């Protein structure tokens, strides 16, 4: 379903962007699919969100005194920012290991799939954050608050 919806969105982007209710409904479906705990689904949806964020940043330019997305686009933008905040993978793993000489060295493990997903989601996040930085700040502060509460409740 995600492959079909994102494929239709990519092939008919101009038509969908002209039909706001249809574009919002399709975007809502992709948002629901992106919440599934499947990494392949997330990759498909991340490409869609990258195109969607580009469309919104062109439609609602902030730097030129334009307005942030309002109404349903604003709600969907907020939900996508929350999803990106929750599901964005770490860029790469860095571990400290002892080599054969007994020295502690830094070892980076490469996850090319994860790096590509991270870059795609990061670009979407940056574009959406530029559109409505107040909502983005509130979402990030809430996520940090949850981490602090979790750390304070976990035993040392």
Enumerate the predicted regions with their spans:
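Alpha-helical repeat/alpha-solenoid scaffolds of the HEAT/ARM/MIF4G superfamily
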Residues: 28, 35-156
